[in-house]
């Protein structure tokens, strides 16, 4: 019987084990070691895949790496046929997650700076966006809203316009961001977000609750927001209530 302790990394340990243990016990021991090694290797790989995503880039409405295209979706050769196949916000959302590509150059063209210099640019119609699903936040929001109004008008889809503190990108001022809200079971949901394509946020008890959480996610202060029937309207709601006079 051995009274001295040997590390498992010590050659003496292996020699003692081979001398002391019967063949069946040795085989069981080495099998267990191999299983543990494989298990730890698998867990290490999985932990790398499920790492916490980085914080959102506050200077861009482009998708984050964590929201890369994933999951099944229903495709169609034309927009009209898609309207026949899709039934829900989830169908629209899955297609956006798989197909949408952010257009940084167009974002600069639609910036506050260039719009003041060159005038307004048209926002892509749903059929045009379906044929070439590249654009910016307001393009994907218009596509989702008008499509959802066709499929399920009862969920009351609306634009949600968010106004951030302005940032300057390539000398262009950016402050507004667009996505779509809808209601289900008395709760609020939000999707068609160019920052998180393929993601439906909710349920929330109120729009304000979502806006508060979204400001934290984006790392930017929201100074105003409004739910709108059209992207062309100019209504405004303060993000933080002013004290009573």
Residue ranges and their predicted role:
Residues 142-216:
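Hydrophobic/aromatic-rich core segments of domains that either
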Residues 57-132:
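Secondary-structure boundary elements
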Residues 216-245:
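Low-complexity, Gly/Ser/Thr/Pro-rich intrinsically disordered linker/tail segments
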């Amino acid at each position: 019987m051995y009274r001295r302790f040997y590390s498992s990394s010590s050659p003496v340990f292996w020699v003692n084990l081979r001398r002391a243990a019967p063949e069946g016990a040795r085989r069981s021991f080495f099998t267990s070691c191999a299983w543990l090694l494989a298990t730890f290797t698998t867990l290490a790989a999985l932990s790398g895949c499920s790492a916490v995503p980085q914080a959102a880039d506050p200077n861009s409405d482009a998708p984050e790496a964590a929201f890369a295209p994933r999951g099944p979706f229903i495709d169609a050769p034309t927009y009209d046929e898609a309207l026949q196949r899709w039934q829900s916000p989830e169908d629209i959302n899955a297609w956006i997650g798989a197909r949408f590509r952010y257009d940084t150059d167009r974002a600069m063209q639609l910036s506050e700076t260039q719009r003041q210099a060159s005038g307004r640019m048209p926002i892509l119609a749903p059929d045009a966006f379906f044929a070439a699903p590249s654009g910016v936040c307001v393009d994907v929001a218009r596509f989702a809203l008008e499509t959802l109004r066709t499929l399920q008008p009862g969920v009351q889809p609306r634009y949600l316009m968010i106004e951030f503190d302005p940032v300057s990108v390539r000398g262009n001022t950016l402050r507004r961001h667009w996505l779509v809200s809808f209601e289900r079971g008395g709760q609020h949901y939000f999707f068609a977000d160019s920052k998180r394509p393929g993601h439906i946020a909710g349920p929330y008890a109120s729009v304000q609750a979502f806006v508060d959480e979204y400001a934290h996610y984006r790392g930017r202060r929201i100074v105003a927001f409004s739910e709108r029937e059209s992207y062309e309207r100019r209504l405004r709601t303060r993000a933080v209530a002013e004290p009573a006079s």
